[in-house]
Amino acid sequence: MQRAQSAVDFSNLLNPTVPADKESEKPHQGDVEMATAAVTVIKPNGPLPGVQNSENSNELPRPYKCPLCDKAFHRLEHQTRHIRTHTGEKPHACQFPGCSKKFSRSDELTRHSRIHNNPNSRRGNKAAQAHQQQQHQMHQQQGLPPHMMPDGMMAPPPAPKTIRSAPGSALASPNVSPPHSYSTFALPVSAVHYNRGGDISMLAKAATQVERETLTAPPHHSNNHRHHPYFGHGMHSSRGHLPTLSSYHMGRSHSNEDPSDDHYSGAMRHAKRSRPNSPNSTAPSSPTFSHDSLSPTPDHTPIATPAHSPRLRPFSTGYELPSLRNLSLQHNTTPALAPMEPHLEQNQFQQGSAPTTQPRPTGMSLTDIISRPDGSQRKLPVPQVPKVAVQDLLSDNGFSHSGRSSGTSSLAGGDLMDRM
């Protein structure tokens, strides 16, 4: 009985009939109905009434609905925050200086502010350092000029700074500047010298230190007050070592400059040792050159120009130029400046500096040629050999009578004077 029954069951499985198909479809239909019921429960827009009644007892009501979508919120703040996601509005801006970020939510702003407030954050340190550097640069650009300059003068102070480090630079003012314009340049430097605060640049501090090192003789302070009434009170501590260079354009009203020249030649001999005759030689970077370039002299050589400038002849006094010539000579055999008016002073200084040029009767003309600042003009005494040849031509016996008469040598000297 069991075998037949199993055989029938096996045959039914191999060849299924229509009622068997219907019986197999019934559980499948039941699964589909359960899935549709589950979908209706999960669907937010159409929940089942029984499920909604069970959830209302646990959740708060959501009266605030978004007008742009189907979402509802418990509080008004949540609704407004959600609406900003649709509009793109970002009302919460970062208040930290230098940061321009904006956020739509306040919690995002507080989370962002921790970047600036946290000292351990690398990003916050970088942003803070960049902001401090920007503020420091702005203070330097905006805050320094009122401290360094008096009212109404914005442009002059950069000029003395650039002239201090470059003696022969072209940044100087025109060489015919009157004394009143020179005082406008000198007064801001005195203001920089006395405003020893945090606003003064490092260049000004270094310049004042160099000035203090180069000041060797204290009597210049009284002489400076005597020679410079325009800016004597402001410049007596930093400009005391220049009594004669700047007194070229001030010397018409001050003719008693003998002791100042003595002090100048005695004290500044060590400070100006590295500047013999050439304009390109090195010299200490002090504000001395601002006086030279701003005085009415040409710009190429500060010391050797007064001999060749026609504007300085009425301003110079008797003992002014020889003292500068003695200063510039020091160890040389040829004078750096041509003799100006008196001849006794030249002989007096040639005894101390160049005793070899005295025995010649034509030494004045030769020194005038030798004292030219150009090297090519300084080599003009080479025609001494043609001078001997001219004497040989004038004399009958050649070199035996070459030193016979002083007229031939004076003729040769006059020829050299005519060449000038």
Curated annotation (Swiss-Prot):
Residue ranges of region Disordered?
A: 1-31, 97-152, 212-319, 346-420
Pfam name, any one? zf-C2H2
Q: Which spans does this entry mark as compositional bias, Polar residues?
A: 1-15, 346-360
What pairs make up the disulfide bonds? none
Q: What residue spans carry the Basic and acidic residues bias annotation?
A: 20-31, 254-264
Q: Does the keyword DNA-binding apply?
A: yes
What SUPFAM superfamilies does UniProt report for this protein, alphabetically? beta-beta-alpha zinc fingers (SSF57667)
Q: Which UniProt keywords apply?
A: DNA-binding, Metal-binding, Nucleus, Repeat, Repressor, Transcription, Transcription regulation, Zinc, Zinc-finger
Which BP terms from GO are recorded? Answer: carbon catabolite repression of transcription from RNA polymerase II promoter by glucose
On whether GTP-binding is a keyword of this UniProt record, the answer is no
This entry's Gene Ontology molecular function terms read: RNA polymerase II cis-regulatory region sequence-specific DNA binding; zinc ion binding
Task: Quote the cellular component terms of the Gene Ontology held in the record.
Answer: cytoplasm; nucleus
Q: Where are the zinc fingers (C2H2-type)?
A: 64-86, 92-116
How far does the signal peptide extend, from start to end residue? none
Family per record: Belongs to the creA/MIG C2H2-type zinc-finger protein family.
Output the PANTHER family linked to this UniProt entry. REGULATORY PROTEIN MIG1-RELATED
Q: What does this protein do?
A: Involved in carbon catabolite repression. Represses the transcription of a number of genes by binding to a GC-rich region in their promoter.
This protein is called: DNA-binding protein creA
Organism, per UniProt?
Answer: Fusarium fujikuroi (Bakanae and foot rot disease fungus)
- Source taxonomy: Eukaryota, Fungi, Dikarya, Ascomycota, Pezizomycotina
Q: Which gene encodes it?
A: CREA
